[in-house]
Amino acid sequence: MEGAKPTLQLVYQAVQALYHDPDPSGKERASFWLGELQRSVHAWEISDQLLQIRQDVESCYFAAQTMKMKIQTSFYELPTDSHASLRDSLLTHIQNLKDLSPVIVTQLALAIADLALQMPSWKGCVQTLVEKYSNDVTSLPFLLEILTVLPEEVHSRSLRIGANRRTEIIEDLAFYSSTVVSLLMTCVEKAGTDEKMLMKVFRCLGSWFNLGVLDSNFMANNKLLALLFEVLQQDKTSSNLHEAASDCVCSALYAIENVETNLPLAMQLFQGVLTLETAYHMAVAREDLDKVLNYCRIFTELCETFLEKIVCTPGQGLGDLRTLELLLICAGHPQYEVVEISFNFWYRLGEHLYKTNDEVIHGIFKAYIQRLLHALARHCQLEPDHEGVPEETDDFGEFRMRVSDLVKDLIFLIGSMECFAQLYSTLKEGNPPWEVTEAVLFIMAAIAKSVDPKKPFSIAVCHHSLLFGWNITSEISNCEYLSVLRENNPTLVEVLEGVVRLPETVHTAVRYTSIELVGEMSEVVDRNPQFLDPVLGYLMKGLCEKPLASAAAKAIHNICSVCRDHMAQHFNGLLEIARSLDSFMLSPEAAVGLLKGTALVLARLPLDKITECLSELCSVQVMALKKLLSQEPSNGISSDPTVFLDRLAVIFRHTNPIVENGQTHPCQKVIQEIWPVLSETLNKHRADNRIVERCCRCLRFAVRCVGKGSAALLQPLVTQMVNVYHVHQHSCFLYLGSILVDEYGMEEGCRQGLLDMLQALCIPTFQLLEQQNGLQNHPDTVDDLFRLATRFIQRSPVTLLRSQVVIPILQWAIASTTLDHRDANCSVMRFLRDLIHTGVANDHEEDFELRKELIGQVMNQLGQQLVSQLLHTCCFCLPPYTLPDVAEVLWEIMQVDRPTFCRWLENSLKGLPKETTVGAVTVTHKQLTDFHKQVTSAEECKQVCWALRDFTRLFR
C-alpha cells in the first residue's frame, strides 16, 4: 500500500466488510485491501491504535494478527531504539485484552514471543515475564500462553534468526526452565478445580518438553509428572483435559528418544504409561472414542520411543514387550481409526527388524505380527449391508490401502507363503460370511506378489476342496492336476483355480476383490499357462459388468505385463477389446491400462506382424481424432481429443519390440501415417495448453518408440513447434525439444538444425521470463528450458558452447537458482552441474581440449557471479533439500579450477551479512573461515554438502 496512511475509520469499514458484508465480492475486496495494509509500513502504527481503542473483537483480532505477522516478516522495518517500546506496548495490550477473546490473546502472545526471539537486548525474558505477572492470578492465563508459544516459535520457519541466535535462545530457555516448572507447580496449586488452568499448564509443559530443555532428572521426580498420569487414570476426566494431558505425555516421550541419557525420566514414563491399560479398557467400556484415541497415541509414542530397546533387548527392561501388547489391545478396538494411529510404529519396527536380519529376533516378533495381521483383516471387513464394490476413495478405502501397504512391509516376518496359506485355510474351514471372505481375499491380494510361486510349501490339498464355502471341481484331469501340484506350489494353484470358478451369485464386492487377487497372481498364471484361458474368461465376465469393469481391466493389464509371451496367442482378443474399449464402463485410467497391456503383448509378436497390428490398435483412436477434426464446435458435443491422445501415447510408450541394427523399425510406417492427424490436432488446439501438452506427450512417445526412425518427422515437427511457440509459450514444446535433442543430438547432420530450434525457442522464452515475477509465475518453463539445455550439453556440448545463446542461457540459469520450486530448481542445478562437468569429462575424447577451453571461457566470464549467487540462494532462498544439488555444482567448479574457486568463494563469503539489523551475530569470522576451509579442502562432494548444511543454518 503506497501513499498516505489510511484513516482508522477506513480500516474499521474494511474489517466490518470482511466479516459482515453479505456480498462475497465485497468481502474479497476488503480482504485484498487489508492484506495490502498489512504489508505496508503503516500497519505498525494502525495496529497499535486499534488495540488501544478496543472497539470490537474483529478489529482487535485483525490488529493482533497484523502485529504478529509484521514482527515475523518485517521486523527490519523498525529502528532498534523502538523495540523496547514495542515490547512494553504489546505487554500492555495483552493485559488489557486478556478477557476479550482467547484467539486475540494467542496472536498477541505469538507477537511477544517472536519479538523476544529477535530482540537480543531483551535478556532473560522468561524471568522478566514470570516476575511481572506470576503474582496476579488474572494474568496467569496469558502468561502461560506466552510461555507456551515461546518454545514453539524457536524453530519456526517464519523467523530467520539463524543458528547462533537460536543456540543462544535455547541455552537461555534451558537456564530458566526450572523457573517455568516452578511456576507451573504454583499454577496447579492455585488452580484447584479450574480445568482450563490445568489444560494451560499441561500445554505449556508439553511445549517445553518438545524443545528438549527440561532437565530429565529434575522432571523424573516432579509432581507434575505424577499429576499427568493421575489425570489420565481418572474416569471422570473431561475430554479436553484428557487430550491436553495426553499431548503432554506424548511430548515427554518424544523428548527422551535418546533413552540412555534420560534414563530416570524414561523409567518413570515407561511405568506410568503401563498403568493406563485399565483406564483404556474403561474408556472402551464407556464407548469414549476420544479417550481411546488418546490412549492409543500414548501407547504408540511409548513404543516409538523405546523401539531400539524393543528390537535389541526384547522382553528385557525397557524392551519389555508389554508395550506391543498395549498396541495389539488397541488393534482389537472395533473402530479402525484406533489401530491406524499405530501404523507408523509398525512400519518402523518392520524396518528395524529387516535391517537386523536375525532369525532368532524375527522369531520373537512373528507371533505379534501374526496377531496384528489378523486384526487388520477384521478391520478391513465391509459392513454386512454394504452394496456394490468396495469404495477406494473414501476414508475407509484409504485405510484399506494403508493396511495393504503395511502388510506388504511386514510380511517378511511371517513368510509370504505361510501367511497366504493360513489366510486361505480360514476360508476353507466352514462357511464364512461374505464380508469375512472379501477381507481375507483383500489381504491375500496384498501379499500375492511377494509369494514365490516356485517355493514349495507343505499343506494338505484336497482335490474336492471347499473353497470359501463353495464346492468346486476341477475340469483338469486328476493326473494333470497332480502333475501341476508336484511342479508348483499347491496353495497358489488351488486358490487361483477356486477364484476363477466363483459363481456369479456371490456378493459383488467378493467378485471385485477376487478379480484384484487374480491380477496380483499374474506370476502364478505365467508359471501355470494352462490357467490362462479360464483366467481370461473370468476376467472378461468382469469386464462386461460396470461395477467390475475397471478392476478386471487392471487385472488383464497385470496379466499382459507378466505373461507377455503366453498372451501373444491372445493378441487378437486383446485387439477386439481395444476396438470396443468405449463400450465397457471403464475409468480413463483402466482403459489406458488395458491398452498398455495390449501394447506390451504386441511388442512380443514377430516383427513382420507388428506394423499391421499396431496400425489396427491405433486405428480406433486415429479415427476418433479425425472425426473431432472434421466436426464444427457445437454446444453439447465434446471436441476434447485428450482421451484419444492419451491412448495413443500409452500405445507408443509400451510398444518396444527388439529391433536389430539395420532393420527398419516396424512402428515407423504407422507413426508416419499418424503424424498428419497429430499435427492437425496440435494446430487446431494450439491455444489450449492442456491439449497441446497431451499432443506433445503423444509425439514424445512416438519419437521414443522409433528413435532415429522418426527422422522424416524432424523437420516438419520442429517447424510447427517453433511457429506455435512464438504465439503460445507452452513449455511442453521445450520438453519435446529436449527429446529431439536426446535422440538426434549426436547426429552430425542434425546438430545445426537442433541449435536453430533452441535459439528460436529461447527468444520468446526469455521474453516470458523477463516479465514481472516471470520466474515465479512460469516454473514449468524454467524446468523445461533447462531440460532442453541439459540435453544439448549431454549430446552435443561443443555445439552449444560455441553458440551465441550459451551465455544468455547461463545467465538465466544463475538467476533461476533462487527459484523455490523443486522440479525447476533441480533442472537448473542439473544443467549447471553438467555444463561445468563438460570441462573435465571424457578427457580421452578428441574434443576434450576444445570443451575444456570453452568451459574456461564461460567460467572466466560468469564464474564469480555463479558462486556468489549459489551461496546467497543457499543461505536466503532455498529449502535444505536443495543443498545436495547446489553442492554438486560447487564441486564441479572446484574440479575445473580449485585455486580460482577458492578466490571466488572467499569473495562471496565477504559479501554475506555478518549481523542482523538488530545487532545479533549471524556468523562469526571463525565460522566463515572454517566453512571456506571445509569446502575447498573437500575430497568428496558429500563433504561440500555437509559443510553447506551446517553453514546455511546460521542464516535460517
Regions found by a protein language model. Give the residues of each.
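Karyopherin-beta/Importin-beta family HEAT-repeat alpha-solenoid scaffold
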Residues: 1-956
